[in-house]
């Protein structure tokens, strides 16, 4: 880039003013050409930068967007058991054919049991606008003492009646 001194800039200052009736058609043609070039550059950029880079992000969080993944498939049989079906990472048919043709070792393969876990949130730590129920608060308090003899006596009385 060419650098000019202040004196040179004052000499290069245009002394001619534009006429009131200048040709706007040429000016608009130049603007349209620039718009087309910018559009082509954006298309080229988007073709190379696929994925979340092409998306616009709001400026308040400055983070990458969270890409949602599909939920795993869980099937429930007639007995009520739920089984988790994992994604297959490749074609298993090719691997089975290779192992059948070349029996090199007869080591048993360990399989991982697949289970579905249900997680319950700890509701005491979740804030709410609704006031707490006193029955829940009483149920959460630990029992300070337990009289085993009183419990045995009450069971014996129930058996006799």
Curated annotation (Swiss-Prot):
UniProt feature, compositional bias: Basic residues: 52-72
* Chief site of localization: cytoplasm
Q: Does the keyword Endoplasmic reticulum apply?
A: no
Q: What post-translational modification information does the record give?
A: Phosphorylated by casein kinase II complex (CK2).
Q: Could you tell me one molecular function GO term of this UniProt entry?
A: translation initiation factor activity
One of its Pfam families is CAF20
**UniProt keyword annotations, A-Z:** Cytoplasm, Initiation factor, Phosphoprotein, Protein biosynthesis, Protein synthesis inhibitor, Translation regulation
Modification Phosphothreonine occurs at: 99, 101-102
Location comes to:
Cytoplasm
| Residues where Phosphoserine is found | 78, 91, 154
Disordered: region residues: 52-108
Task: Enumerate the InterPro entries for this protein.
Answer: Caf20
Which ranges does the record mark as transmembrane? none
Q: Can you state the subunit structure given in the record?
A: Interacts with TIF45.
Q: Which family does it belong to?
A: Belongs to the CAF20 family.
Recorded protein name is Cap-associated protein CAF20
Q: What organism is the protein native to?
A: Saccharomyces cerevisiae (strain YJM789)
Task: State the taxonomy lineage.
Answer: Eukaryota, Fungi, Dikarya, Ascomycota, Saccharomycotina
> What would be the name of the gene that encodes this protein?
CAF20
